[in-house]
């Protein structure tokens, strides 16, 4: 066998060097090195430590001799000559193998076609690709992680931006820019989240719009935090807002005048009702009560007895009239209803779905709030739509049916004020939309 291999090799020095290196391997490995005289073949045989793998490697060499690899084989004549030499080498090699290996040598010819591709693929391309993928994974992970959506609500983002500004005031464009500078995530889909920022500014009473003063020329009004908003977030962390403050924020919800109205009305009193509506942004910040909820509750109770009864009676009797007079009644009702803040908190938009869901939310917030909310719905022309009032709860249905009769009870509770306020701000559109 060695003689035949040497004849093919033509160079004893090369053979001896290969033979010395392959000494550690089985006779098949030695045969491989001698047959191919090709560094690539030795690499393949070394990568496959088992004798069967070595045999496939040798057969692989044989199959490649005819193809493009033959020119690179040193000392082997390209073309069929090398193939014939190898053919002679394989049988002789099989004779030297142990009996158990002999059948494998017979199979080498059948393996010629498949072995080269399987071995080559397994040797470099797959491993190389896997290494490349492994090196890329951390980068892609880091990249996606740094651009992940921040765990802050839009209200938190706006509050952070305003609080970190020197003047505690920012224009809308400055708020956008601050968010984009701090959070790369918001550098994409700007139109989408900027709409949400505008909604948050408009629909949360904790944000006040401050018109530009003559000494500060420029475009756009300033936005600042309500002086009574206090610490809106738990433990100074922007991840979670305190429910209490949410109610505070929302008491004057959006309604233009109604928003700051409720706060202004509660602090100023019934006299401020008409002015508070117009004073929406400016008056409410100054006149709004810092203990919004508590002050509003007391005011609500007081005012519910004062102007609530006349206006409340009108609202259930004729919702259209109540809608017209809602602004006045709304002012008093807003001040009267501490529920109004929570109601704002519970609903994001004055639509029937939110009102329906408010029953559950109110259960969580305050039990009597359920009554308020349901009654609110009832006062709002939801009485006409029976399933709305009944949906909230049987209590809601009863309240709706007996809005006029239970007027005394309604007056005692901020429910009526809430309902009238809500009507004042939204009753007509809400009724239409619902």
From Swiss-Prot:
Residues 249-262 have a biased composition (Basic and acidic residues). It comes from Xenopus laevis (African clawed frog). The lineage of its organism: Eukaryota, Metazoa, Chordata, Craniata, Vertebrata. Keywords: Activator, Developmental protein, DNA-binding, Nucleus, Transcription, Transcription regulation. Residues 149-243 bind DNA. The keyword Transcription regulation applies. The gene is foxa2-a. It comes from the Eukaryota. It is found in: Nucleus. PANTHER family: FORKHEAD BOX PROTEIN, HEPATOCYTE NUCLEAR FACTOR 3-BETA. Residues 408-422 have a biased composition (Polar residues). Acts as a transcriptional activator during early development, limiting the extent of mesoderm formation in the gastrula. Binds to DNA via the target sequence 5'-GT[AC]AACA-3', with 5'-GTAAACA-3' being the preferred binding site. One of its GO terms (biological process) is positive regulation of DNA-templated transcription. Its main location: nucleus. SMART domains: FH. This is Forkhead box protein A2-A. Residues 249-339, 408-434 are annotated as: Disordered. Gene3D superfamilies: Winged helix-like DNA-binding domain superfamily/Winged helix DNA-binding domain.
């Amino acid at each position: 066998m060695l003689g035949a291999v040497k004849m093919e090799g033509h160079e004893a020095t090369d053979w001896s060097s290969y033979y010395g290196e392959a000494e550690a391997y089985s006779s098949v490995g030695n045969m491989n090195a001698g047959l191919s005289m090709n560094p690539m073949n030795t690499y393949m045989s070394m990568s496959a430590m088992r004798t069967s793998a070595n045999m496939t490697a040798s057969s692989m060499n044989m199959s490649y001799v005819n193809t493009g690899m033959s020119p690179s084989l040193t000392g082997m004549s390209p073309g069929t000559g090398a193939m014939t030499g190898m053919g002679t080498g394989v049988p002789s090699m099989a004779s030297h193998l142990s009996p158990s290996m002999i059948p494998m040598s017979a199979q080498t010819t059948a393996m010629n076609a498949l072995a080269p591709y399987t071995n080559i693929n397994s040797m470099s391309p797959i491993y190389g690709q896997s290494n490349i993928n492994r090196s890329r994974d951390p980068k892609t992970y880091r990249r996606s992680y740094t651009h992940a959506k921040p765990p802050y609500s839009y209200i938190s983002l706006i509050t952070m931006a305003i609080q970190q500004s020197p003047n505690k005031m920012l224009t809308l464009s400055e708020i956008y820019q601050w968010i984009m500078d701090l959070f790369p995530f918001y550098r994409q889909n700007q139109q989408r989240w900027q709409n949400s920022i505008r909604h948050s500014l408009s629909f949360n009473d904790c944000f006040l719009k401050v018109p530009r003063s003559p000494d500060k020329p420029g475009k756009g009004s300033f936005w600042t935090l309500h002086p009574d908003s206090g610490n809106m977030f738990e433990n100074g962390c922007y991840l979670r807002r305190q429910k209490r403050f949410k109610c505070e924020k929302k008491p004057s919800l959006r309604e233009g005048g109604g928003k700051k109205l409720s706060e202004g009305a509660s602090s100023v009193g019934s006299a401020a009702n008409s002015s508070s509506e117009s004073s929406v942004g400016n008056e409410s910040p100054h006149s709004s009560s810092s203990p919004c909820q508590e002050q509003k509750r007391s005011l609500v109770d007081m005012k519910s007895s004062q102007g609530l009864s006349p206006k409340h009676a009108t609202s259930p009797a004729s919702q259209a009239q109540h809608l017209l007079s809602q602004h006045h009644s709304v002012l008093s009702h807003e001040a009267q209803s501490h529920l109004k803040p929570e109601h704002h908190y519970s609903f994001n938009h004055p639509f029937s779905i939110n009102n329906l869901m408010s029953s559950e939310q109110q259960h969580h917030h305050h039990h009597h709030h359920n009554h308020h909310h349901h009654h609110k719905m009832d006062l709002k022309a939801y009485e006409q739509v029976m399933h709305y009032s009944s949906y909230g709860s049987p209590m809601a249905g009863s309240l709706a049916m007996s809005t006029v009769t239970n007027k005394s009870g309604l007056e005692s509770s901020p429910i009526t004020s809430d309902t009238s306020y809500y009507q004042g701000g939204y009753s007509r559109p809400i009724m239409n939309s619902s």
